Amino acid sequence: MPRRKKKGKEASGAQNLEKKDAETASSVSVKKKRRIEDGFIVISDSDGEEPKEENGLQKTKIKQSSRAKCLAKRKIAQMTEEEQFALALKMSEQEAREVNSQEEEEEELLRKAIAESLNSCRPSDASATRSRPLATGPSSESHQEKSTDSGTTEGIWQLVPPSLFKGSHISQGNESEEREEPWDHNENTEEEPVSVSSGSWDQSSQPVFENENVKCFDRCTGHLAEHTQCGKPQNECGRGSAFLKAVQGSGDTSRHCLPTLADAKGLQDTGGTVNYFWGIPFCPDGVDPNQYTKVILCQLEVYQKSLKMAQRQLLNKKGFGEPVLPRPPSLIQNECGQGEQASEKNEGISEDMGDEDKEERQESRASVWRAKTKDFQEGPIKTLKEKLLLEEEPTTSHGQSSQGLFVEETSEEGNSVPASQSIAALTGKRSSVLMPESSAEEITVCPETQLSSPETFDLEKEGFPDSRETLYEVSIMADKEVDNREDAKKEIHTSTFSSSTQVSCPLCDQGFPPTKIERHAMYCNGLMGGDTVLTRRQKEAKNKSDNGIAAQTSLDIDKNEKCYLCKSLVPFREYQCHVESCLQLARVDQGDGPEESGRLCLAVDGKRPQQLKNLKEKDRSEGRLISLLEQSEYKTTDAEIKTKFSETGDFRVPSAGVEEAGCSREMQSSLAHLDLNESPIKSFVSVSEAADCLVDFKKQLTARPGSRTRTKAGRGRRRKS
């Protein structure tokens, strides 16, 4: 019994040894296959398909390398610095050699693969064009052909999808065996003439090339060159050779091997197929071709953007030149001197040179002022009278004609400078009298925006052609000019330039001296009678001053009332009687003439002979005023308006209350044609003047200041809109 057991143990041990030998032989064959596969370039388009055995080998290699690194680190830690340096040099040399050897090996492999692909593509080889002898009879020549062209057949075999086999009842495991069997056959060509596996491979490969499957196979993989031909030569090469030729630089052959998108989709639907990607040159192994193309597109986009940026930097903008000034350089130098003087005064710079310059300027200005005052005292009134009669322009009670307009007219008609100087002096006096001292420093108020005081009204009323030559008027004007010498200096200094040079505003077409055109242009909004635009701080100060002026005018109105017809101030007690007399005079003027109207006016008012002359002139204008009121606003002409205003120089524009009552709508429309700096708020008239109206406004006298503020607010809204 024990002998039998020993025999059974020996038999089982022999079986185990045989199994081990078979396993080792299979492992050796697998290793040899791997070596052969490494020797040839297998071209396949599968994405990331790697056998499991290679992964295992890679893991073992990684473990071994990690162990070696740990040992090397321990050794390096025990070595000195010199030894470490020498070791580093040796390691770098070895790495360089390995890199060079790898490159050389890769080049050799590429050369071999290219040579084999070229040999496989030759249709002249008689042995390559016949695939039947492989199945009919074993021969050493056919096996040698297989061994020489095994690389290309392996590449083509991997490209064939399993679903294309007509009679493919073979499992995927059998397919893998069949793929391995040709390599086993190649190993044993010398020992065994024909193996069973080779016959099975031939039998399984025969249905591939029958009938229509050959065409489909050719569309998917290009075609099968020599090994897979049924007696019909093909001139085109397979896909593997096409790729290798593309590597060499012949990109035209790869176009013949490109499958259509529909074929690729059909292959994907059948299952177990290979995904093909075309059009990406030299895509790295293991990289998604779609992402690789995105990277290429991004690089192109970055290149285009950088090119555009470089082109933009080449463009250089032309620099701005010198500003174009609207005046000659002499005026600029004069203004620069004035600006320096003002800055010295404000900052309080106490320097010797600065004091000398100031004294020289003051002396020069004083000499100019003395010469101008002499000229002014000789004949300012006659020149003013002649100018007003010739020009026939309106002069309102609060100095409506600005300095710029007078200067323009004098330059056109050739009148002398003292006339403009006298007007400048009068306007300077009015602005200084009406504005408070506190707000005079902060804001610059135009004289047109202020109401006239009784003194200036009497002065202008008495300063008409018949009464201007009186000595009383000359003395008043001289006193005012002496009191306001500094203001008059400034006005006369600017008027010396204005007669020769006059700059017109491009927005409102008004003429201004060169020293004032810039300030006007800053605030000009295109309106003919636009006031200077003020800041919030200036508006607040102006509102305060307007409130004080409104209080003063209310006191003045309590004393005197202005007649709307004759534009004269009348005591409040005599106002009603005066208005009735004016109305009677207007009616009589239409029928009998101005002489009877003058008598009635003398009888009712009892004025002095000085007012008789003014009333005669007013009576002439009253007839025209009523005729204008009777006419429609569209039929009035500019000639009638000019004559009317030349004879009645003290007219004011009607107030808002009178306009509501309908007493002067035609008058307002006729005044709209004139380029006057007028508005209802500038020449405010009390409600009691509207005697002919249907509405009784006397009950609303207490609401006068409020109405003034409302109209100002309304004007502000209109300007904003």
Curated annotation (Swiss-Prot):
Gene Ontology terms: biological process: chromatin organization; double-strand break repair; mitotic G2 DNA damage checkpoint signaling; positive regulation of DNA repair; response to ionizing radiation
Principal subcellular localization: nucleus
Subcellular location: Nucleus
Stretch list, region Zinc-finger-like region: 505-582
PTM comment: Sumoylated.
Biased composition (Polar residues): 117-130
SMART domains: UIM
Ligand binding (Zn(2+)): C505, C508, H520, C524
PTM-bearing positions, type Phosphoserine: S29, S44, S46, S101, S140, S205, S402, S420, S467, S627, S655, S679
Chain positions covered by the region annotation Necessary for transcriptional repression: 1-101
Region of interest (AIR), residue spans: 270-400
Low complexity bias (residue ranges): 194-204
Keywords noted in UniProt: Chromatin regulator, DNA damage, DNA repair, Isopeptide bond, Metal-binding, Nucleus, Phosphoprotein, Repeat, Transcription, Transcription regulation, Ubl conjugation, Zinc, Zinc-finger
Region (UIM-linker): 97-103
Motif residue range(s): LR motif: 60-78
Any single GO CC term annotated in Swiss-Prot or TrEMBL for this entry: nucleus
Residue stretches of biased makeup (Acidic residues): 349-358
Domain description: The tandem UIM domains form a continuous 60 Angstrom-long alpha-helix and mediate binding to 'Lys-63'-linked ubiquitins. UIM1 and UIM2 bind to the proximal and distal ubiquitin moieties and recognize an 'Ile-44'-centered hydrophobic patch. Since UIMs don't interact with the 'Lys-63' isopeptide bond the UIM-linker region between the 2 UIM domains determines the selectivity for 'Lys-63'-linkage, and its length is very important for specificity.
PANTHER family with a match to the protein in the record: BRCA1-A COMPLEX SUBUNIT RAP80, UBIQUITIN INTERACTION MOTIF-CONTAINING PROTEIN 1
Subunit-structure text: Component of the ARISC complex, at least composed of UIMC1/RAP80, ABRAXAS1, BRCC3/BRCC36, BABAM2 and BABAM1/NBA1. Component of the BRCA1-A complex, at least composed of the BRCA1, BARD1, UIMC1/RAP80, ABRAXAS1, BRCC3/BRCC36, BABAM2 and BABAM1/NBA1. In the BRCA1-A complex, interacts directly with ABRAXAS1. Interacts with UBE2I. Interacts with NR6A1. Interacts with ESR1. Interacts with TSP57. Interacts with TRAIP.
Family, per entry: Belongs to the RAP80 family.
Protein name as catalogued: BRCA1-A complex subunit RAP80
UniProt source species: Sus scrofa
